[in-house]
Amino acid sequence: MLTYPNIDPVAIHLGPLQVHWYGLMYLLAFLCAWGLASYRAKQRDGWTSDMVSDLVFYGALGVVLGGRIGYVLFYEFDKFLENPIWLFQVWTGGMSFHGGFLGVMIAMLFWCKKYQKTWFQTLDFVAPCVPTGLMFGRIGNFIGGELYGRAVTDPNYPFGMIFPTDPLHLVRHPSQIYQALCEGLLLFIILWWFSSKPRPRMAVSALFLMGYGVARFVMEFFRQPDADQGFILFGWMTKGQILTVPMLLIGLWMMWYAYQKKIYDWGPQKNS
């Protein structure tokens, strides 16, 4: 069994100002996305550093607003009704990927209108930069001791740990780390490699939806369902899995459509 590194949730103390690890992870996520997007812009015609900076700003707004609102609506609506101010206490944790995803989609519409880019041109450009943000977010969950995994059933399992935030004090899977590695690092490697060569428009976005859909669906088997949600369908499907299935199906259709149309935005087969 591993020992949980009981880290102070406040990363930096500056007098009355406290910087929480959760907020710091989001800052690192946005900085990493900006760096990766800036690198990609240098490899593509029609992209500038100002466009990238604006894109990250729009994306950050979409992630924070959509992620928080989505978490409240999907998972903690009763808590919000009891204390509406809690919606704005982002540093306490509680963000929904699916809400953040929808928030980014809406934000990208405004950015595309401003810079005269198509939606899928933009999403294909952004998609490989997203998984690193997911990775940092899950690390923030781990440090905060939230969204931990299900109880370990094998007493000889070497990676289980007891989270101090768990009222039952059971040996559990560190599912946040599993998700950081699968939904974050592994998906980043796959998307970065796939997007390094000319692909049909929508293909990179499709692979992101498919890759995240598979990774999240599998990781949910290790993650403890929210206490007020439990298993919603068939006695084993969680809210996260139900929300992820449409992403996977849409991604499959998009990949098929992309290779049927074969519209290229860069490379030797670029279409005007």
Curated annotation (Swiss-Prot):
Its main location: membrane. One of its GO terms (molecular function) is phosphatidylglycerol-prolipoprotein diacylglyceryl transferase activity. A 1,2-diacyl-sn-glycero-3-phospho-(1'-sn-glycerol) binds at R138. Keywords: Cell inner membrane, Cell membrane, Membrane, Transferase, Transmembrane, Transmembrane helix. It is a multi-pass membrane protein. The keyword Magnesium does not apply. InterPro entries: Lgt (IPR001640). GO terms for biological process: lipoprotein biosynthetic process. One of its GO terms (cellular component) is plasma membrane. Pathway: Protein modification; lipoprotein biosynthesis (diacylglyceryl transfer). The chain crosses the membrane at residues 17-37, 55-75, 90-110, 125-145, 174-194, 202-222, 230-250. PROSITE patterns: LGT. It is found in: Cell inner membrane. Its EC number is 2.5.1.145. The keyword Cell inner membrane applies. PANTHER family: PHOSPHATIDYLGLYCEROL--PROLIPOPROTEIN DIACYLGLYCERYL TRANSFERASE (PTHR30589:SF0), PROLIPOPROTEIN DIACYLGLYCERYL TRANSFERASE (PTHR30589). Catalyzes the transfer of the diacylglyceryl group from phosphatidylglycerol to the sulfhydryl group of the N-terminal cysteine of a prolipoprotein, the first step in the formation of mature lipoproteins. Belongs to the Lgt family. This is Phosphatidylglycerol--prolipoprotein diacylglyceryl transferase.
